[in-house]
Amino acid sequence: NCGNGACATRKVKTFRVGNPVDWLPLLILGVATAAFGKQFPPWLYMWVLALALFLGCKWLCFRIELARGTNAGVGRKLGFLFGWIGMDAAAFFAKANPTEKPRAMEFTCAATTILVGSVLLWIVTKHVLTINPLLAGWTGMVGLIFVMHFGLFHLLSLAWRAAGVRATPLMRAPLLSRSLAEFWGERWNTAFNRLAATFLFRPL
């Protein structure tokens, strides 16, 4: 920072990957789920494990922004931790652009997607099950993705954006991808992409 003819450096906090405090929730939740979750039915064990990993990773992303010195208020922080599915804390805590407010058509599309997914999940799957159990499993999975990832999670993104928060949609129209890299890197499951870019990938 420079002013009055003099310059000074400002120490910026950095996120330490090796800090045990930052990784402790993920470790505890993961170990506890692996140790005690197998007594649950397989489908419930899967959901509990997914929730444990999600909460642990959410905490790591939250800690990064705390270390960088975010100016977000308590309400915004709690909203990111417990009211949003994404992992991009920097965008969530930043000031939103008024032009990013969602359009009414986006709400309609999300609601329609939930309806289509519900039909696949609770009606079509039952009929397909009598013909081919494997196909029924895939049909149910597609229906669930429509209901959750393209439907409910997108509605949640729209609600936050309507409130002036930069909540990037989890699915960003993946069918519009012009390349495989764009599909996986920018449009499909942006929460996972943020995790991979932050903790796995490193610039060459």
State the predicted function of each range:
Residues 61-64, 156, 160:
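Hydrophobic/aromatic-lined pockets within catalytic cores
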Residues 1-2, 7-149:
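Non-catalytic, membrane-anchoring transmembrane segments at the edges
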Residues 25, 29, 132, 153-157, ...:
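N-proximal short alpha-helices
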Residues 150, 157-204:
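Membrane-interfacial catalytic/cofactor-binding modules of polytopic membrane enzymes
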